[in-house]
Structures are given as C-alpha cells and as structure tokens.
Amino acid sequence: MKKILSLILAVMMLAVVPAFAVDADLSFGTQETGTAGYTYATAIQTVIQKVDGINVTLLTNSAGNVSAPVLIQEEEADLTMSNSAPAMWAANGGIESASVPECPDIRCIAGGLGHDFVNVMFTQKFVDETGIKTVEELVEKKYPIKLVIKKNGTLGELAAEKVFGVLGVTFDDIISWGGVVEKTGGAQIKDGLQDDLYQMTVDHIGAGQANTTDLCINHAMYDVQLSDDTLAKLCEEGFDYVTVEPNTWNGQTEEIKTVGSQQCVLVSANLDEEVAYQITKAMCENKDVLAEASAALGYFDPTVAGSKALTGCELHPGAARYYEEMGYAFK
C-alpha cells in the first residue's frame, strides 16, 4: 500500500510541474548606465525575470543599436536591442559603413519598441533663398547643399545615406556638385545650423529630442515632406511608416508623413525555443509595465510586434509560436 501511495504522490507531483518549466541564465547586452538604451533594457529585464527559471544579467557592452547585432552573432550576449532596419541590414550582408559584418544567426523576439522617425530639415533661410522645399527637387537640380549629419556608424548617418540613396545619390555625388557633407555630434549639428554654416540635416530621432527641440525654438527651420515614392522606397530598405504629429517641433503646424526604424529585441537562432517563447510571452503580457518605465516603450503593440516591418530579421521560432497561438501578426 505504501508503495502505491508513494507512486500516486510522485505522479501528482509531476503533474503540477509546469509544462513550460525553463532554466536559463541569460546576459543582456546594452549601452552604458544613464542612456535610453539602458532604461529600456532594465524594463525588459524586469518583465523577463517574472518567468520562473529565467535570470537576466545586464552587460554594458553595446556600442549602440546599429552594431548591437554583432553581440549576438559573436556570442557576447544572449539578448540585445537593435533597430529593425539595422537588424535587416546586418542579417543580409552586414553594414559596411558601420563596420558591421554579416550576422546570419540573429533572430528577433519582438519589434516596435518606440516611435522614432527619419527627420529631414532645411533651414528656413535656405528655402527662402532657393525656393527648394523638397529633397527630390534638390537632387533634380543637383544643388550644392551644405549637409550636416551624425557621425559614421550612427542610425542618423545611415538614415541620411538611405534618404539620398533611394534617390540614386551618394554623399560623394553631393560633394561633386560643390556641396558639403559634414559628420559630427548632435550639439555641433545644432550650433552649425543655428549659425547658418549648414543648410540641411537628416537624423533618426524621437519627438522631444533635446538638440532638435532647442534648434527649432532658436532658429527658423523648415520641415521637409518626402514624396510618397521616396517613402515607399525607404520602406523597402527596412523602414516603416510613421506620422509626426503637428507641433512636434516649434513652427511645425502640419503633420509630416515619414518612416522610422523602431527598436527590437534580438537573440541567437540557437536560443532554446521554449526560453524564447517565454521571453516573448512575458514581454507581451507585461506591456503596461514596459510603458510605465519609458514613454517610448508605450508604443509597443504585441498584436504587430512580430510583423516583418518591425522585426527586421527573421523571427525566432519560439517567438513565432507565441504570436501564432495568440492570433497576432507575424512573418
């Protein structure tokens, strides 16, 4: 009888063990303390660790979202954050201008973490003097524009490269027209435009970005609307449509239709499928916790987080399984 009771007890104990029991000690590669990236990573770490058996340690070994896929490819972190467009470029040949090699082993857990966008501006003085109001017209006329953008390897610099690239123009072409392409820091960009040393800038930023906010308050700027055809071509390059609401910047009275590349969480293709499933589930079922940590994370929408436009690279099978079970969009 004792043997029978012991057997029954053992079976009952096995029955209450969750089918999804996991045991994983993961590292999350992020940027240094005090950055927005670190804030996002901390919030995601918090919700992932709600899963029994998963522990996440933050490593401040990421140089930024453009090069972040390398951390996964070279097994320097189990998770990291990138943006959908750089993730796509890294997975499909690498990013030469940012010295990012091809990263075929990266997979996405979830995308759409943010509301950043490609921001194109002329100085109002430039528009008044030339009558040029669009990038397409500038390119058609081969105008020797004085362009100032972020440094090599930043998403701002790559966004500028793509805006001109889909119009068939390189930075070398602009220089050959007699123009200038200056790559520098954010504060220097703001000061240079305010002093009318430059006439145009392109960046990838979010509403409220300090330098652009200050620039538009202290200097008359013109918000440039890209054509529908240009926007469609940029979407083919890994971006997705974003609307910039009126009054995002001082003097901007109308909405601007543009594109952006939102942040995404990357893991290795070799990550255990059940672990990836549980990470995805934890993020999606705790989206309110993420939103409380950062306004940018409030844009996270689980119903589309697995869609191609937001993931950049291939979804991890564990993540795809969760989205499919929930009836959410996934590729």
Predicted segments with their positions:
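Ligand-binding clefts/hinges and TM-proximal coupling segments of bilobed small-molecule sensing domains
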Residues: 131-159, 240-308
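Bilobed "Venus flytrap"/periplasmic-binding protein-like clamshell domains
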Residues: 25-51, 56-59, 116-195, 308-318
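Solvent-exposed loop/turn segments at secondary-structure junctions
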Residues: 33-36, 64, 85-89, 116, ...
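N-terminal segment of the mature folded domain
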Residues: 64-117
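Extracytoplasmic
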Residues: 23, 53, 63-64, 74, ...
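An extracytoplasmic/periplasmic, membrane-proximal ligand-sensing/linker region
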Residues: 40, 205-208, 214-217, 223, ...
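Sec-dependent N-terminal signal peptides of Gram-positive bacterial secreted proteins and lipoproteins
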Residues: 4-21
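Pocket-lining segment of extracytoplasmic ligand-binding domains
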Residues: 84-86, 94-96, 102-104, 108-110, ...
